[in-house]
Amino acid sequence: MNYKEWLAQAIADLAKKNPTENSKIDALVLLQHATGKSRTQILAFDDTEIDEKVRLKLTALLDRRLKGEPIAYILGEKEFWSLPLNVSKGTLIPRPDTEILVEKALQIALEKLEENPPHFRILDLGTGTGAIALALASELAPICQKRHIPLEIIGVDLMSDVVALAQSNAERNQLNVEFLQSRWFDNITGKFDLIVSNPPYIDAQDEHLHQGDVRFEPLSALVANDEGYADLRHIIELASSYLNSNGVLLLEHGWQQGEKVRSIFQENHWEMVETVRDYSDNERVTLGFWKK
């Protein structure tokens, strides 16, 4: 069997099993992963015969995808903000919608850096793969270096293996971010200019937990008590103690949670509370300033 024949069969199998997914892209990515060849090489030399060892590997990979396992877990990596990130089954898979949080955090950070502060500190709570912290570091480190403003970015996660994974991503992308093990603020000292988080926010009874990629993702990174609001509320209530004056907290949340999250911010005396919409025009990120 050659590349062309395997692709045709794999595309047909995937389309039959998961008609809403892009079967051609999935099949090609799996073939690239198994052979170590680029997309261009595979398509240009599609009559290349597949040896038995690679064919067995492809069969195993395709079987996992046919069962619905996300491509990111099969490959062990996912790109976010143009950064290649290692992923594991202990972390959420970084999603494009989370780039909305990064974009807004960058906008606020750049405005604050215009004031030439003596230093700039950012905290990422529940960092997972480190995606948010590393994306911010990739953009802000060159700017802070040019302006001679010391930049410190810290990412925390509850699980030690997840912290190690995030650290591996910092090393892979040669970015200076410190990753610590902590349950939210428990092991955090000092104050920050920005606090960002994509915490668990799904209700345990949500039917979407049994659909698509989330079936394979860790429930601890997805589900929160109090109909999904427990961790959001906890962070909003405590974050003010860890922010400098005029510091900002930015939180990602579910597309139907914006109104409730804004009210929790306001109940806790945050100012200039606003919600940012994602690429699908859903309320996705809510932020507030701490003026006290």
Curated annotation (Swiss-Prot):
Pfam families reported in the protein's UniProt record: Methyltransf_31, PrmC_N
Presence of the UniProt keyword Methyltransferase in the record: yes
Family matches, as InterPro entries: DNA_methylase_N6_adenine_CS (IPR002052), HemK-like (IPR004556), Methyltranfer_dom (IPR025714), N5-glutamine_MTase (IPR050320), PrmC_N (IPR040758), RF_methyltr_PrmC (IPR019874), SAM-dependent_MTases_sf (IPR029063)
One record GO biological process: methylation
Catalytic reaction annotation: L-glutaminyl-[peptide chain release factor] + S-adenosyl-L-methionine = N(5)-methyl-L-glutaminyl-[peptide chain release factor] + S-adenosyl-L-homocysteine + H(+)
Family: Belongs to the protein N5-glutamine methyltransferase family. PrmC subfamily.
UniProt entry keywords in alphabetical sequence: Methyltransferase, S-adenosyl-L-methionine, Transferase
Keyword Thylakoid (UniProt): no
Entry EC number(s): 2.1.1.297
One of the record's GO molecular function terms: protein-glutamine N-methyltransferase activity
Binding-site list for S-adenosyl-L-methionine: G126, T127, G128, T129, G130, D157, W184, N198
UniProt binding sites for substrate: N198, P199, P200, Y201
Protein name as catalogued: Release factor glutamine methyltransferase
Gene3D superfamilies for this protein: DNA helicase RuvA subunit, C-terminal domain, Vaccinia Virus protein VP39
NCBIfam families in alphabetical order: hemK_fam, RF_mod_PrmC
Organism: Haemophilus influenzae (strain ATCC 51907 / DSM 11121 / KW20 / Rd)
Enzyme class: transferase
HAMAP family attached to this UniProt entry: RF_methyltr_PrmC
Functional summary from the UniProt entry: Methylates the class 1 translation termination release factors RF1/PrfA and RF2/PrfB on the glutamine residue of the universally conserved GGQ motif.
